Amino acid sequence: MNENRTFATPDAVPVRAVVLAAGLGSRLGEPSSRRPKPLTPVAGRPILAHTLGHLAGVGVQEVVLVVGHLREAVRELAGGEYAGMKIHYVVNPDPSTTNNLRSVRLAREFLDQDVFLLEGDVVFEPAVLERLAAAPEASAVAASRPLRPLAGTVVRADADGVLTDYVDDRRQAGAFDHPGALKTANLYLLREAFLRERFLPALEELDRRLAGQGYYDYAVSDGLAAGGHAWRVADISDLAWYEVDDPGDQRQADFRFSPPREQQRILESLHGGYWRYGVTDHALLYNVHFPPAEMMEILRSDFDAVLRNYPSAHAPLTELAATIAARRPEEVVLANGSSEIIKILARLRGNWTVPVPGFNEYENVVGAERVHRYQLDAPDFRLPVEDYAAFVRRSGVDTAVVVSPNNPTSVGVPLADLRRLADLVGPDVLLVIDESFVDFAPAPIASIGPFLDRHRNVLLLKSISKVYGVGGIRLGYAATADTELARTLRAELPIWDINGFAEEFLRVLPHFRRAFADSCRQMRQNTLALAEGLAALPGIRVVPPDANFVFVELTGGIRAPELAHELFRRFRILTKECSGKSMPGGDAYLRVSSRSRAENEVVVAAVAEIVGGPRGAATTEGAGRADG
């Protein structure tokens, strides 16, 4: 919450509030059939409980609740008195057929003095009320820089916060373009003179003319147009607030009003979508230098057609993927992310060997009873292929996994060793080589793709989403010279599991091969610089990276869960702590994905501030392997 608080003088704070709590909340889905919208829980408490607590905290003495849908549940929460405040109820008998203009009009007998007028689906921090009441004698509207595309009433103010423009939806015909405007938060302080002379007369006229179908914003707007009253905009852009209309809003509000550790837990449970939450994502793995601007413009130009039309089925899409994989279409399986193929393989195959620590998806989908874990040893976490092959044979499995470069260690397996391993495990073992990050790796680490014809027991897996920087469209493929295996995998896929945006990306991608190669080189340089910066900090050992992320061991007093939390709490940076990985002492390891040079420098500076002390000599024999 924000510490820059604006305190109201006691005589500027109304002693009465009107809270609109009659709405259906239908956009919240099934819960709205058994719970009124203002009782939607946010951070463990109903929105209305937050609101009533804040009102009591600023000295409000009585609250008028306009109720309608499931009104008895509201009465059960608020009762006749709440936190020392007298509670009155006004019933809107037709909440399903009228809008909030009618609800406010029904409460008109309580609009005879200064009041807070608040909507019951808005959760906010207490300082919002203080900021509304900061100017004695002036009515005020709380407004904020938009949290999402503008919708609803917007306002403008001069440098002193005086309201200069109030634009409700009646003045928003055509394209909604109001640069510099603030979005109202549906939280008001209305002074008695404005209510009596402007608002109530406008409210009566509008309700008569619109038969309850309008919004009270119209009465505010019409009253302002008549002039003669002081109005201010309480800019709450730096304060926490959220209007909860749908489940996505509820998740956002939960996040905003939870303590930092719970916020971190919420984000980690999402496994993506972090861009909506105002954090820098160094947890998931990206190529931030691809797609280039020209490619993005091409994709944007076809947006309408791609959105409205069905994508192609598998055959033409597989041909596109085969072009990228440099294989024949019958050797390629295209899926909605490589994880989809992993899950299919888990159903079709028997027992597996998996080097650990590794990509958890293999262990999770195969199941503990069918996984034989091969422990990679610190400090370098390299895969000794002869020993691993012997382990595979002893285990009697039919499927063996290698991730190169490995996730989370960022350590790759040289191509010659992969080919040797394919021979050593024998033709009866399917060797799954996941090379989703190989494009970022230096020689001698390289793709086995050109040699699949000589190793028919190899299934190559590749995440297009990760390497090409398009995590939002979910694409991955498998390639193998065993066309019967490829056919079996394709048969497990639905006819339309690839969406139109993914198809359009595949169609355009071959025109940008050079740009992709350049992006990988840039990511490689970014990652080496990140590794070098982290290695120069006290108490940190960096495993030389072969991928677009850095695996670090914490050798000082701080553990990875604590460091990850401090990075989030203090700097809004997400990283991946590895205590959940199958490895001894996982709480000493942190994975940091590489982004732009500037973002990586922020991470290094943040870690330096947390671990303490000036940057010293590197604690590893060089942070990165030389390319070449």
From Swiss-Prot:
Its cofactor is Mg(2+); pyridoxal 5'-phosphate. Pathway: Antibiotic biosynthesis. Changing K466A: Lack of decarboxylase activity, produces only CMP-5'-2APn. Residues 278-628 are annotated as: Decarboxylase. The modification N6-(pyridoxal phosphate)lysine is found at K466. Gene3D superfamilies: Aspartate Aminotransferase, domain 1 (3.90.1150.10), Spore Coat Polysaccharide Biosynthesis Protein SpsA, Chain A (3.90.550.10), Type I PLP-dependent aspartate aminotransferase-like (Major domain) (3.40.640.10). This is CMP-5'-(3-aminopropyl)phosphonate synthase.
